[in-house]
Amino acid sequence: LGVFSASKTADGKKFEPLLIEGEKIESVCRLRIDQICFTNKRIIFFDNKLFSKKKVRVFLPYKSIEGFAIREVSMFNPDSSLSLMTSSKVFDLEFTKDTDMLEIQALLSKYLCA
């Protein structure tokens, strides 16, 4: 499981039932509230709100992502974040401080720039 060391920060078992034929988990990372899974076909995560009981599964094929932005850890913000831009919405995801965002950037570039 996982080509990148960022995958060691979370367990991907909860994503395995969601995979389609031929899909493989590349990396699973901890988000501030939940987890995110990068596969060879798409990104899967749960769009949770901190004080909401609603949990929405988001399946985002790489081909629907128009761009992304990464904010690294800084003195005033201990968490890194990733913004995924689609034609209809921007998904802002907050990662825990131990996530290697350079590896996330490399993974996204691999599928978005191919």
What are these regions (language model features)?
Residues 7, 62-65, 71, 94, ...:
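Generic signature of intrinsically disordered, low-complexity segments enriched in small/polar residues
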Residues 19-35, 39-90, 110:
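Phosphoinositide-binding peripheral membrane targeting modules
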Residues 98-114:
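Terminal and domain-flanking low-complexity segments
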Residues 1-36, 98:
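Anionic N-terminal interaction surfaces
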Residues 86-103:
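Canonical phosphoinositide-binding patch of PH/PH-like domains
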